[in-house]
């Protein structure tokens, strides 16, 4: 049964992946051998992920697979160990079928900056799939797997989930171990699921979460359960609504009516620091990314990153290098850290009396594949997703319709460590939309 399912998925990958470029490494013999072992293991049948076929973003270590981060820098580097999340997946009966494409070193929100070529959006082939977890979202959307892992630094799970019409979830900072993740910005990064249903997002989050001594930011949390959301106070932030295009705003307003029908109370909120989101996020991102890339010096892991990387990666390294210097760090980086505290404190304050916040995931529809955007135009896609990373919130995306065939995702955000509420709201909304 499991072997048969793996073979079916391998056939689909063979037929479809050439076109959409969602996966950059597949080892049929390896996954079939693991499937045969799993099928013979009677005890494994009781495991929660038994036989689930999973794709993993190319910045997460899976032993024996290349961990390239979709860059020439690491194109020949084979992961020597499993990341904590991969250990947990394997322990619970999951099968890794392949490695997903992504924006190079997670620098991008379009899926176009990969050394291995851009990923196409299975739901709108002339449009970007979003990024940086482009391949993970596209693989789930094109039914090349049951579920996938991505990472989210400023929207990198939620952005492609919205564009590709799938479910994505960024757990609260500290819920999931990042041991074995090649970080973009360590104070923002979280690993999370991309799935076909919100129930599956809950399932996979429960498997991968938990305290890990190898990641000191992690905390132990009780298993997340599906709760009744009747009576929830649902916040709607005026400034978040104002940023979104009119057509996307219409979809969100219809989604708000669904929550009313589910017995929720709608509460209007105001957040005065929306304008600080992008500069705060990117200044911290640049500095942390520059710091994390110093290991790619051409002596230990592969090529020297500055000599072979793409334009966006080089831009971030150069800016990060500049603002890390003593004469600039006080002017830019330290001010960004102050702004981060302002944003976080204000967010916690406005969320005090609500259970969740709902709104748009991205302010506009995905642009056309190959369309030239300035860096600021590209960064603007992140304006509604970066606040969750800056403030340590949990945040998920669930499909809420489409505009001319292009999917639109509803973003649901919750207070730190109230992941259960967000996942419950995602499940309830998805069921109401069926």
UniProtKB/Swiss-Prot annotation:
Keyword Ligase among record annotations: yes
- SUPFAM superfamilies cross-referenced by the UniProt entry: Amidase signature (AS) enzymes
What UniProt keywords are attached to this protein's entry? ATP-binding, Ligase, Nucleotide-binding, Protein biosynthesis
Kindly indicate where the leader peptide sits in this chain.
Answer: none
**InterPro entries tied to this protein:** Amidase (IPR000120), Amidase_CS (IPR020556), Amidase_dom (IPR023631), AS_sf (IPR036928), GatA (IPR004412)
Can you tell me where the transmembrane regions are? none
Its Enzyme Commission number(s) read 6.3.5.7
One Pfam family per UniProt: Amidase
At the top level of its lineage, which domain of life is listed? Archaea
Catalytic site: 57 (charge relay system), 132 (charge relay system), 156 (acyl-ester intermediate)
**UniProt keyword annotation of ATP-binding present:** yes
Per its record, what are the GO molecular function terms? Answer: ATP binding; glutaminyl-tRNA synthase (glutamine-hydrolyzing) activity
Catalytic reactions of this protein: L-glutamyl-tRNA(Gln) + L-glutamine + ATP + H2O = L-glutaminyl-tRNA(Gln) + L-glutamate + ADP + phosphate + H(+)
User: Which HAMAP family is this protein grouped with?
Assistant: GatA (MF_00120)
Q: Which family does it belong to?
A: Belongs to the amidase family. GatA subfamily.
Q: What does this protein do?
A: Allows the formation of correctly charged Gln-tRNA(Gln) through the transamidation of misacylated Glu-tRNA(Gln) in organisms which lack glutaminyl-tRNA synthetase. The reaction takes place in the presence of glutamine and ATP through an activated gamma-phospho-Glu-tRNA(Gln).
What name is this protein filed under?
Answer: Glutamyl-tRNA(Gln) amidotransferase subunit A
Source organism of the structure: Methanocaldococcus jannaschii (strain ATCC 43067 / DSM 2661 / JAL-1 / JCM 10045 / NBRC 100440)
